[in-house]
Design a protein with these regions (language model features):
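Structural signature of alpha-solenoid helical repeat scaffolds
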Residues: 37, 68-69, 99, 130, ...
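Short acidic active-site motifs
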Residues: 29
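Structural detector for internal amphipathic alpha-helices that build alpha-solenoid repeat scaffolds
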Residues: 3-24, 32, 40-54, 62, ...
Length: 778
């Protein structure tokens, strides 16, 4: 039974009754409940009727052909027929042929929502009905089904200029994304009744061939025309980039416009625009470039957050040409605008002075971003002021200053850090020692040794990290001594640092001793350190911590055993799979993925199919590490797991797995509409055998899958994938050639134009010839 959150107790009771009626196959009683006042209950009734299949079809048809007094029951009956598991198409065709307008419209709607390809001829006939409502319903149904007949019908409707058919057909034609849509839509741009809708539809085509038409609108005196043209240009860019991965088509096409006049018109049109329109205008200004565009973009930084972010991104894309205006704005702006400007300031030293001025901004976020920007620039003249910020009251600023100083390096940095570590208070010594620890110079050793005697735990922590970075016997001796310190925090830091040292016998012996330390964090870091330098002899004492009182120690022990490997470690990992502690089980699964022993593979089954989603997720990740034939099948099954996280992981892991089996599995998963986008994204991961596997699939797949696979190859942006597209244009499968044609752009594949010209002249399929011709005209 469909479980719905938010039901009242009475609604849950009625939904349960509907499920009971389904179990009894009580079709008539369920049909009677289509008028239930609760949408949630009707949803349960619709679900039950759809699962009854063929036996519910005629009773539902009777609801639609009866007295039709209840709009509620009519809508519910349509939903039930749309989702029915039965053979609905013939009954829906009878409805569509009805002389009753409302019944005919319901029939067309059902056929469209079920994507009944076999009904296209009848729907095409209805699209020419004398009744505008019937014709519109048929057109919408054809739009849901798609295909070449849909494009032809929409073009015919648009060119009819019959308002009640042409107007809705404009949107439907644009949504086909077909290159042939551009010309008829362009013919409407000067028609007062259709122009604005045609501009929107041109955007929805996602066709670069429409860009010159829209670019002309950017200089019109009407601000509304300019705004809608900008929105449509952005939509073309996003759709084309999303489909084929090519991001230069629209910006390249806009290079021929008069940048100054277009920028002025866009800036003026932005004044009364809404947030989405201003955001689009910002992006178009970024593509156009030039001083007027940059000036307008700086002004848009003060708009709503969405627009400001878009303007900042456009300024960042203009890089060096925008720098003078950016720096001028940085000098004169308040904190809010500086938050947008600082991340996009370039790496040239000419920006140093203006960025340094931001270190005095009252907003700590601005000061932190200024530190980050100075680190990117790398101008050593900023070192003195960055050292002043080490004592900033806000920790983010202090840490940002440390990171910037570390990025610069040099003798001046080391000199200042040494001086501060010697003379500063505890608050100043910590960042100074952290800087010195980053460079790990042996000349800093006395300061680190002195720091280990500091009464402040935090200073000792930083000093211990510095000792770990210095390759000197005195540093190692100090760390060994610190592992006996009275402070558990200092012992833990020292033990962690010992894990970064050479695997000498004194170090290994001391780490083994600290496995028995009374503090859990000391034991934890000891286990981690031994996993790196302990060797197989450490396996047994580490295995003794599998039942430690502290959960994080148990998990660390599992991870360490996996890294140490060996028969004893593997046996301990197998044993840990039976633990009552879910964290230990997950750690053991991760460990088995590290070891990758074929003998462990069958043991993953219970975790892969268990009740706990988090454990299944870890099991799927471990599974992918094994090199056995069954891995691909198990990952494909996990792609239908109830947990969205597990499904996503399984698909992504298939995407990164080389070989034809993984590619075939992913292509098979494209049939699942819910995960289709994620599967397509996974297929774009370039691994051995991926391109070859996609081409093999293109030779046999239908139109929908072929279009997706062509987009995958185009988005790879690799020479092998480009050659594969060109090869696919010669495949016998006409669906592959139809899908490839829109991708044959010089932006995507070098020989694109030549192949389009060849296809327009000699392809055996008329639709391919027309597609190629339309693209070439664009």
């Amino acid at each position: 039974m469909t479980a719905v959150l938010g039901m009242s107790a009475r609604e849950r009771e009625r939904a349960a009754e509907a499920e009971a009626l389904f179990e009894r196959r009580a079709t008539a009683d369920l049909v009677d409940r289509l008028t239930d006042p609760s949408w949630l209950v009707r949803r349960a009734v619709v679900s039950a009727l759809s699962r009854l299949g063929d036996e519910a079809i005629e009773p539902l048809i009777a609801v639609l052909t009866g007295d039709r007094r209840s709009e509620t029951s009519i809508a519910a009956a349509v939903d039930a027929l749309v989702s029915s598991l039965g053979h609905v198409e013939e009954a829906a065709l009878r409805l569509a042929r009805s002389p009753n307008t409302a019944i005919s419209c319901d029939g067309a709607q059902i056929l469209g929502r079920r994507r009944a390809v076999s009904a296209l001829p009848e729907l095409a006939h209805l699209a020419h009905s004398d009744n505008d409502n019937v014709a519109l319903s048929a057109l919408e149904a054809v739009g849901r089904i798609g295909g070449e007949p849909a494009v032809d019908l929409f073009i015919e409707a648009v060119e009819s200029r019959s308002f009640f058919r042409a107007f809705p057909a404009i949107d439907l034609l644009g949504r086909t994304g077909d290159p042939r849509a551009v010309r008829p839509l362009a013919g409407l741009l000067r028609h007062p009744h259709y122009a604005l809708e045609a501009v929107r539809a041109l955007g929805r085509t996602g066709q670069p061939g429409a860009v010159p038409l829209l670019a002309e609108l950017l200089t019109r005196p009407s601000d509304a025309d300019v705004r809608i043209a900008a929105v449509s240009l952005v939509e073309i860019h996003d759709r084309y980039a999303g489909r084929f991965g090519a991001t230069s088509a629209v910006p390249s096409a806009l290079r021929t416009v008069d940048a100054a006049s277009v920028s002025r018109r866009l800036a003026h049109a932005a004044t009364d625009a809404d947030s989405g329109e201003r955001s689009a205008i910002s992006r178009v200004l970024g593509w156009i470039g030039g001083a007027p565009a940059i000036h307008a973009l700086v002004g848009l930084l003060d708009a709503d957050p969405e627009t400001a972010r878009a303007a900042a991104a456009s300024l960042a894309s203009l890089e060096r040409s925008a720098e003078p205006e950016l720096l001028r704005a940085l000098r004169t702006s308040g904190s809010e605008r500086r938050l947008l400007l600082l991340p996009i300031v370039g790496r040239r030293s000419s920006a140093t002075t203006d960025v340094i001025a931001c270190l005095d901004d009252p907003n700590p976020n601005v000061r932190a971003l200024a530190c980050e920007a100075l680190g990117r620039i790398g101008d050593a003249s900023a070192v003195p002021v960055l050292f002043e910020r080490l004592g900033d009251a806000d920790a983010r600023v202090s840490q940002g200053a440390v990171a910037a100083i570390q990025a610069m390096g040099g003798t001046e940095v080391e000199r200042r850090a040494v001086e501060l570590a010697r003379t500063g208070g505890a608050r100043a010594r910590r960042p100074a020692l952290r800087i010195l620890a980053y460079f790990g110079s042996v000349t800093s050793l006395p300061l680190f040794l002195e720091g280990m005697a500091d009464p402040d735990d935090r200073v000792r922590d930083v000093a211990a990290n510095g000792l770990a970075a210095v390759d000197h016997p005195r540093a190692l001796a100090a760390l060994l001594e610190a592992s006996h310190h009275g402070s558990s925090r200092t012992r833990a830091t020292a033990v962690r640092a010992l894990g970064q040292s050479d695997a000498t016998e004194p170090v290994r012996a001391r780490l083994l001793e600290t496995l028995q330390d009374p503090d859990a964090w000391v034991r934890y870091y000891a286990v981690q350190a031994l996993s790196r330098i302990g060797g197989l002899a450490s396996a047994e004492p580490i295995a003794g911590l599998l039942h430690d009182a502290a959960g994080h120690v148990r998990v660390a022990a599992i991870d360490a055993l996996a890294r140490l490997r060996g028969d004893q470690s593997l046996e301990a990992l197998h044993e840990a799979l039976g633990s009552d502690d879910a964290d230990v089980v997950r750690a053991a699964l991760m460990g088995l993925g590290i070891v990758r022993s074929a003998s462990s593979f069958p043991l993953l089954g219970p975790a892969l199919h268990g009740a706990d989603a988090a454990t299944r997720l870890v099991a799927v990740s471990a599974l992918a590490e094994f090199d056995v034939n069954e891995v691909v099948d198990e990952l494909a099954k996990a792609a239908f797991d109830p947990s969205e996280s597990v499904r996503a992981a399984a698909i992504n892991l298939l995407g990164s797995r080389p070989g034809p089996d993984a590619t075939r599995a992913l292509v098979g998963l494209l049939g699942d509409e819910g995960s289709r986008d994620r599967v397509a994204a996974a297929l774009t991961t370039y691994v051995a055998g991926r391109v070859e596997g996609i081409v093999a699939a293109l030779d046999r797949e239908g139109p929908e899958t072929a279009a997706i696979l062509v987009g995958v190859l185009a988005r790879m942006r690799r020479p092998e994938a480009q050659l594969a597209l060109e090869h696919a244009f010669a495949l016998e499968n006409v669906h592959a050639r139809r899908a490839v044609a829109p991708a044959l752009s010089p932006d995507i594949t070098p020989r694109g134009r030549a192949l389009l010209e060849q296809g327009a002249k000699s392809d055996p399929d008329e639709h391919v010839r027309r597609l190629c011709a339309a693209i070439l005209r664009g």
